[in-house]
UniProtKB/Swiss-Prot annotation:
Pathway: Amino-acid biosynthesis; L-lysine biosynthesis via DAP pathway; (S)-tetrahydrodipicolinate from L-aspartate: step 3/4. Catalyzes the condensation of (S)-aspartate-beta-semialdehyde [(S)-ASA] and pyruvate to 4-hydroxy-tetrahydrodipicolinate (HTPA). Gene3D superfamilies: Aldolase class I. Its EC number is 4.3.3.7. PANTHER family: 4-HYDROXY-2-OXOGLUTARATE ALDOLASE, MITOCHONDRIAL, DIHYDRODIPICOLINATE SYNTHASE. This is 4-hydroxy-tetrahydrodipicolinate synthase. Keywords: Amino-acid biosynthesis, Cytoplasm, Diaminopimelate biosynthesis, Lyase, Lysine biosynthesis, Schiff base. It comes from Jannaschia sp. (strain CCS1).
Amino acid sequence: MFQGSMPALVTPMTNGAVDFEVLKRLVDWHVEEGSNGLVPVGTTGESPTLTHEEHEQVIETVVKAAGGRVPVIAGAGSNNTAEAMRHVQHAKDVGADATLVVTPYYNKPTQRGLIAHYEALAEVGIPIFIYNIPGRSVVDMTPETMGELAKHPMIIGVKDATADMARVSRQRETCGTDFVQMSAEDASALGFNAHGGVGCISVTANVAPKLCAEFQAAMGAGDYTEALAYQDRLMPLHNAIFTEPGLCGVKYAMSVLGLCSDEVRLPLVGVDESTKAAIEAALRHAGLLS
């Protein structure tokens, strides 16, 4: 159920407000283009600058628009366990298929604290993906800690943003081969799957969903020669999008293709002219812009 290419959805904005009509259109487009799932209100969905009400409205809108055609993994993390509990419960109540819960950031819990946090959330009764992103949260969940959490039937996988290929094999050892490992890094997704991953929660898939889905399908079929051809086609776009914060880059790329505006909320700002030029060149290289 959880595999392949899953866009880490942007949250479209118009004049400072979430544009729910555009969001619904994006959901339909992603399904039509072959995306294997949708992940709203993560980092790329501007979760830090959404109100609690907006957060819940975006999750509910995506679940309803998807209509069961693809699974929805709802962003539900917080560095406050009680707040995360509210998000996880809401995701369950509106019919999300799973939740994505980031390791608590800023307050730097110990590994024991991480275990207590996730075990408390797992009692809500909806599948949980751990989001391990030490570059943003500072704390790195160890494979051993993840293995302890994987014993809980509701903790089913990880979105891994470490870009450490050896980590995938180590987590297969500690968590078991059925534990669902999804890459959080577009540029290293090929290597991630080769080591035992089953997909990518992708930023680039916001603008190139068909290519990203075909890339993942090639790896799923064991055709890494074909997958490498897709990698070569997409790599300049991965790099250009992440020249500045990825959600800013991918929103600009989407605006070039007429999918949504490039508007982001402060403290983020739109990309500069040199980044715009690099993104446009990369879109041409990928065959997405003439």
